[in-house]
From Swiss-Prot:
Reversibly transfers an adenylyl group from ATP to 4'-phosphopantetheine, yielding dephospho-CoA (dPCoA) and pyrophosphate. GO terms for cellular component: cytoplasm. It is found in: Cytoplasm. The record marks 17 as: Transition state stabilizer. Pathway: Cofactor biosynthesis; coenzyme A biosynthesis; CoA from (R)-pantothenate: step 4/5. Substrate binds at residues 9, 41, 75, 89. The keyword Protein biosynthesis does not apply. HAMAP family: PPAT_bact (MF_00151). InterPro entries: Cyt_trans-like, PPAT, Rossmann-like_a/b/a_fold. The gene is coaD. Its main location: cytoplasm. It catalyses: (R)-4'-phosphopantetheine + ATP + H(+) = 3'-dephospho-CoA + diphosphate. This is Phosphopantetheine adenylyltransferase. The lineage of its organism: Bacteria, Bacillati, Actinomycetota, Actinomycetes, Bifidobacteriales.
């Protein structure tokens, strides 16, 4: 059985994230969606809230072969813990490759974990958590950028 780890800050989870996660679920026996705590970021939602939001967002996906968790450690340590040989990351056209390639090389060095890149769905590639938060902060419509469940939660968090 091959387990893949799909990490991110997911603050908030976007439809782009959900697309990558569901595609990943079609490719692997089990997918661990891991909310990674990034000390460099100040999240709107706690780790537990993000885990719950992702679980709710994936509930209607038709996928059942996923686990949602969080870690404040290295993703490679999480991979070792669950015996996963691969990390899966989505790539947009905005320079994600350069940033993600560096991390992929570090992850391989640390734990011999490979990184697989899935290109973003062209319809969703302009969406990022940062853009969603910025649009929502300014009263813009984020419908279609995030799962419907996230819209009121984000609006409340930004009040």
């Amino acid at each position: 059985m091959t387990i893949a780890v799909c990490p991110g800050s997911f603050d908030p989870v976007t439809n782009g994230h959900i697309d990558v996660i569901t595609r990943c679920c079609r490719l692997f026996d089990e997918v661990h969606v891991v909310v990674a705590v990034n000390a460099m970021k100040k999240p709107l939602f706690t780790e537990t809230e993000r885990v719950d939001i992702i679980k709710h967002a994936l509930a209607d996906s038709g996928m059942t072969n996923y686990v949602v968790a969080w870690t404040d450690g290295l993703i490679t340590d999480y991979c070792r813990k669950v015996d996963s040989p691969v990390i899966v990351k989505g790539l947009r056209q905005n320079g994600d490759y350069e940033a993600e390639l560096g991390m992929a090389l570090v992850n391989r060095h640390l734990a011999y974990v490979e990184t697989m890149f899935l290109p973003a769905n062209p319809v969703l590639e302009h969406i990022s958590s940062s853009v969603v938060k910025d649009v929502a902060r300014h009263g813009g419509d984020i419908t279609g950028m995030v799962p419907d469940y996230v819209v009121p939660l984000l609006e409340k968090a930004l009040r």
